[in-house]
Amino acid sequence: MSDDYFDRLFELAFVYINEDETIQSCSFRGQRWLEEAQTLEQKNSLLKAYYYYLKALKLAYEIPCRFEISVKSTHYGEFKQFQKLAIQAVSKAFTIKSKLAVKHYLPVIQISDALSLSKKSSLKVLFLNFYSQESSKGYVFSKHTIAIPISCLQSMDSSKIYDFLKSAPFHPSMVICYSLERYFEDVSLAYKLYSMLRSLKLDPHFMELANPKKVDSSLSYENYQPIGLTNLGNTCYMNCVLQCLFACKDLTIPMLQGRGLLQNINTKNPLGTGGKITSAFFSLLQSVLLNHGQRSISPRNFLEIVQSLNRDFSIDGQCDAQEFLNFFLDKLHEDLNSNASRSPIAPLTEDQLSAREELPLSHFSHIEWNLHLRSNKSIVVNNFVGQLCSRTQCMTCGRTSTTFAPFTSLAIPIDDVSHVVSLQECLLKFSAPELLQGHDGWHCPVCKVQRSAKKVIMISKLPEYLIIQIQRFKISVMGRKKIDTPLGLSLQIPSKMLVPPSFQSGIGYIPSNYNLFAFICHYGQLENGHYISDVLFNNEWCHIDDSIVRTVGGITDLREDFSSSYILFYKRSSLLEEFEDKCPKMTLKRNVK
């Protein structure tokens, strides 16, 4: 592997120290990065582990460049401890680097390609399934599969492998190796097998098992095809939200894996539904995956459960898609919240609140997020919940008051104009400082009187799935009004456009791009409007209007649909993941047709 690969990875492990940071906060961040690297290394997630080791080592170098440090410096001991740990991590980083080089030398094949090749009569493809558990032994992709105990490979005696290969009915033109138990994430083990098979003049490839857990094949997300949902009387608001959620793989796939989520329902949580909403969603998801060619299915059972829990969602009146989305995600979270029973933290004293304001914002955010996780843990939190920071500053004495709050959707304003407005303009308006003065002034705890103040809202932590609500409905003295301003198509949002520099130095911040994969449009007026959704499926956009599903004609049609968008769904793709996808590695050279 060329040095260019590691040079680019080194550049990607960017380290930023914000102006409000201290030696203590930087040392704390560095130690957390080292801990994360060690955890990832134990999980054989080598690229990410190496990335965090690099960030920690670079931070250990940057701290003395940024701060004047001496034995008398405040928190000198904490920095020395971090520096000591960083020095110890150098050898670990070099070890991982060598493993990465070997890993990307090994030829890889996707499951779909392997299955296609196995059906070609002109090729003699042999599969080798390395296992330790009997349940994994029967996991086969072809009748020409040899199951080999992993102990044969782990031992120093390679003759046992040769004995198994002798039982093959033919001399294979290609050997495809895999392990349901992910043994080949151990690079040294994979390389040992590769060298052994090459010495026998065989052509080995390692199959990537993207989701190795055995699930009901009929319920596999691989079988998903967009299917219409019947409108049961003004239920387009619900149908379009469900279509977008079906496209969230990190929500749907775990629900299909042996009903794992259904077994984790917290029936004792009074804020939940006792599993009603979760079970209803799972049943609907089953129907979608088992549609067997139907053009549409009825979500009546799901709707009845929703209405039994919240009578606001009546089929007789107009309902808001965003309100339904908030309701559903909230109840799904409470059903699956494994930390719901934990007692809340006692409120802070005035002195503690004052001391907290002195912390660097990124450090402050990390503490508040961990406090939130103390009583909130679910698949919804893992994927859909981010964090907002609200900071108010007195314009007389400079005192600040900072609060953090979780969010599942970002409500951003849009100007009421006739020309096209970009999403970036809306985001800038969302984060623009607000002046509080006069009757709307802020009661400063230092000045003890009402003062003019500046208030700003910032995104301090981004979720895996970013949901953005365009505030098209506003309330004025004339009543509620819809804003029909056309929105310019935005297929991708860089994280640096969303998160200010003060939080880009955070412990968990990784530079990312957010890619559009679904959106909901609202047509018409408040009283007689209609919702539709556009969803990306297999790199092709589908326009879904209740029971009707059709392919979007092209970028022009997509741009036209997006101009009326109301709720946007984006999926995070970290620059590290994009780097891993694009990095050079040996792959299958044959053309698969």
UniProtKB/Swiss-Prot annotation:
The active site is at C236 (nucleophile), H530 (proton acceptor). Its EC number is 3.4.19.12. One of its GO terms (molecular function) is metal-dependent deubiquitinase activity. CDD domains: Peptidase_C19R. It holds the Pfam family UCH. SUPFAM superfamilies: Cysteine proteinases. One of its GO terms (cellular component) is cell division site. The modification Phosphoserine is found at S338, S343. It catalyses: Thiol-dependent hydrolysis of ester, thioester, amide, peptide and isopeptide bonds formed by the C-terminal Gly of ubiquitin (a 76-residue protein attached to proteins as an intracellular targeting signal). It is found in: Cytoplasm; Endosome. One of its GO terms (biological process) is protein deubiquitination. InterPro entries: Papain-like_cys_pep_sf (IPR038765), Peptidase_C19_UCH (IPR001394), Ub_carboxyl-term_hydrolase (IPR050185), USP_CS (IPR018200), USP_dom (IPR028889). It is an enzyme of class 3 (hydrolase). Residues 227-573 form the USP domain. Keywords: Cytoplasm, Endosome, Hydrolase, Phosphoprotein, Protease, Thiol protease, Ubl conjugation pathway. Has an ATP-independent isopeptidase activity, cleaving at the C-terminus of the ubiquitin moiety. Acts late in the proteolytic pathway in conjunction with the 26S proteasome. Plays a role in avoiding DNA overreplication. PANTHER family: UBIQUITIN CARBOXYL-TERMINAL HYDROLASE (PTHR21646), UBIQUITIN CARBOXYL-TERMINAL HYDROLASE 4-RELATED (PTHR21646:SF95). Belongs to the peptidase C19 family. Interacts with sfp47. This is Probable ubiquitin carboxyl-terminal hydrolase 4. The lineage of its organism: Eukaryota, Fungi, Dikarya, Ascomycota, Taphrinomycotina.
